[in-house]
Regions:
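Short, charge-patterned binding micro-sites
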Residues: 3, 41-62, 91
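Amphipathic alpha-helical assembly/interaction segments
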Residues: 11, 27, 31-44, 67
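A generic structural signal for short beta-strands and their flanking turns/coil linkers
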Residues: 2-8, 34-36, 50-54, 84-86
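Conserved alpha-helical elements of sugar-nucleotide-dependent glycosyltransferases
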Residues: 24
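C-terminal structural segments of small proteins and small subunits
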Residues: 58-93
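Short glycine-/aliphatic-rich beta-strand segments at the starts of folded cytosolic domains
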Residues: 4-13, 18
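C-terminal binding/interaction regions
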Residues: 21
Length: 93
């Protein structure tokens, strides 16, 4: 069994309040869950109105599958309007 953990740091430049940021983050996390069947949560910068850190986890029996899945998630996030990906890190357990 392989567990992949992806940490993504995002900027939400158009956000003017925590409510604006949370709306963007909720929408993105719901789309990731539905499209890629991964677990997603906001894990840092909870009180910052322009920054968000998402944690994404995937579990499978094959390392190559988990690597590909998390790369698709990164590509998807990069294409999203309204957010700028500042950094990301991946680790496998």
């Amino acid at each position: 069994m392989v567990v992949g953990v992806l940490t993504v740091e995002l900027q939400v430049p158009a956000s003017r309040s925590l409510k604006d940021k949370r709306q963007v983050v909720r929408s993105l996390t719901a789309r990731l869950r539905n499209s890629y069947n991964v677990a997603v949560a906001e894990v840092d910068h909870l009180d910052s109105w322009q920054l968000a850190t998402l944690g994404v986890a995937a579990v499978a029996g094959d390392l190559a599958y988990v690597q590909g899945l998390l790369q698709h998630v990164v590509d998807y996030i990069e294409r999203q309007p309204g957010t700028v990906m500042l950094d990301y890190a991946t680790e496998y357990l």
